[in-house]
């Protein structure tokens, strides 16, 4: 994989319907044991790489895990989400805190937001590629760091993205109506 490779080419942009990908994204907890072609994985990773970040800091590193034994170990550190071990690929999203913009909103580091943007684009690209993404957000950071030899202190595990083909369709998430979440001119 080349650094300068354009993962989202003109032909893909023409066929991409972002709204369709948003609608078809579902939490899937059962994966087929079918390998993911390298081109599809690179499309997902390339989309994550293109995510915006505060001051273009790009504080992310993505660890790709395919080894079945390692996936089992990681799943055991994910608080009851053992099904992720059945996904052909786990993408472990790590943030290097020192590389993130330090004062988002003048009170916090940008890395949680930066990583969330990368995760969102990765999920949408996965849907576009016919893959089922599952965002793992409950895990023991220290155990994951130990298993994957991630440096402690300045690097945090922010998410694990399980990728595969859905064995069965996930249930749609309930969504609040716009009237419940949108305010005009002021909060109240």
PLM ranges: what are they?
Residues 2-14, 18-37, 159-188:
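C-terminal helix-cap and adjacent tail motif
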Residues 100-101, 143-145, 168-172:
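Short active-site-adjacent structural elements
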Residues 48-49, 91, 106-148:
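Small-aliphatic-rich amphipathic alpha-helix that forms the alpha element of a beta-alpha
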Residues 95, 138-139, 165:
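Short secondary-structure boundary segments
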Residues 40, 46, 50-118:
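Glycine/small-residue-rich phosphate/adenosyl-binding loop
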Residues 82-87, 150-172:
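A glycine-rich helix N-cap at a beta->alpha junction
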């Amino acid at each position: 994989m080349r650094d300068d490779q354009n993962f989202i080419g003109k032909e893909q942009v023409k066929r991409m319907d972002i709204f369709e990908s948003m609608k078809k994204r579902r939490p899937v907890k059962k994966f087929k044991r079918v390998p993911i072609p390298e081109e599809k994985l690179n499309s997902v990773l390339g989309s994550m790489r293109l995510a915006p970040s505060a001051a273009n800091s790009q504080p992310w590193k993505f660890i790709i895990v395919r080894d079945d034994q390692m996936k089992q170990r990681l799943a055991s550190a994910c608080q009851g989400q053992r099904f992720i071990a059945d996904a052909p690929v786990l993408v472990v999203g790590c943030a290097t805190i020192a590389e993130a913009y330090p004062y988002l909103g003048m009170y916090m580091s940008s890395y949680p937001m930066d990583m969330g943007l990368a995760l969102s684009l990765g999920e949408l690209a996965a849907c576009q590629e016919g893959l089922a993404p599952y965002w793992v957000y409950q895990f023991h950071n220290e155990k994951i760091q130990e298993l994957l030899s991630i440096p402690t202190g300045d690097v945090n595990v922010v998410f694990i993205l399980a990728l595969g083909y859905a064995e069965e369709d996930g249930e749609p998430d309930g969504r609040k109506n716009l009237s419940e979440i949108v305010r005009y001119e002021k909060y109240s």
